[in-house]
């Protein structure tokens, strides 16, 4: 009987990091969605952040900033649930194997790389839907897909292009996620330890400060891969049915040849502004959710 009573607690203990991670990511996305929309349009060559914002308000209205929100929430429910939950379990196992000692930076980075790959594989279909929905209004009328929501996009993509098309661009998505999570997760833990132990920061100051550092590191590590991923996912065939890029490497080489290395960092200020607050709010929400659960004994 005693073993039967422990089972639900064990299941919740395992599931909790995934639930908390997904919930915190979805809450953060609701706030960051407008900045993410602007970032995508900058990468698609629509102009500066100021001009894009002005044109969207003038021509499309406030609702345009939230186009693709359903896909963004679905992405967090899959990608962030998987990556943050996996990272928590991986680091716990690593600490256990390390006799309870704090992990060195390289082990945190490896856990972040692995968690990012897992999350990207799970969240790739939702990420594809999000990119296409955000880019739709930038296309000529005849080429627009007119998806009504994330589930409509996933259904249409499966029906028109095949189920495997849901993982189009999965390669660069996984690489980008590995780079982002290595920067985000490892630097957050390392910064939090330093700010708390060496600088004497309080709990909230530590969360905010470490989140800002991890957000910048995540942006710097991942933007080149994000740029390539976006180009691959939004590309369409020409009149002869030929795509502009044969794959991620071809896209990267053509971009390097035509625009130089800095082309990969198009929209970096906006991307950094988008990543850092999202990371900060994800950690803050996660911190508050965890505190609330402890308070009520969950």
Curated annotation (Swiss-Prot):
Main localisation, per the record?
mitochondrion
Q: How does activity depend on pH?
A: Optimum pH is 5.5-6.0.
Spans traversing the lipid bilayer:
18-38, 68-88, 109-129, 169-189, 208-228, 268-288
Q: Return any one Pfam family short name.
A: Mito_carr
Q: Give the signal peptide range.
A: none
In what tissue types does this protein appear? Highly expressed in flower buds and at lower levels in roots, leaves and stems.
Name the InterPro entries for this protein: Mit_carrier, Mito_Metabolite_Transporter, Mitochondrial_sb/sol_carrier, Mt_carrier_dom_sf
| Highest rank taxon of the organism | Eukaryota
Location in the cell reads:
Mitochondrion inner membrane
Please provide the record's keywords in A-Z order.
Membrane, Mitochondrion, Mitochondrion inner membrane, Repeat, Transmembrane, Transmembrane helix, Transport
Describe its membrane topology. Multi-pass membrane protein
Keyword Lipoprotein in the entry? The reply is no
GO terms under cellular component: chloroplast envelope; mitochondrial inner membrane; mitochondrion; plant-type cell wall; plant-type vacuole; plasmodesma; plastid
An example GO biological process term is:
dicarboxylic acid transport
> Which residue intervals correspond to the Solcar repeats?
12-93, 103-194, 202-292
Similarity comment: family membership: Belongs to the mitochondrial carrier (TC 2.A.29) family.
Protein's job? Catalyzes the transport of dicarboxylates, such as oxoglutarate, oxaloacetate, malate, and succinate, and of tricarboxylates, such as citrate, isocitrate, cis-aconitate, and trans-aconitate by a counter-exchange mechanism across the inner mitochondrial membrane. Substrate preference in reconstituted proteoliposomes is oxaloacetate > malonate > malate > maleate > succinate > oxoglutarate > citrate > trans-aconitate > cis-aconitate > sulfate > isocitrate.
What is this protein's record name? Answer: Mitochondrial dicarboxylate/tricarboxylate transporter DTC
| Species name | Arabidopsis thaliana (Mouse-ear cress)
Upper classification of the organism = Eukaryota, Viridiplantae, Streptophyta, Embryophyta, Tracheophyta
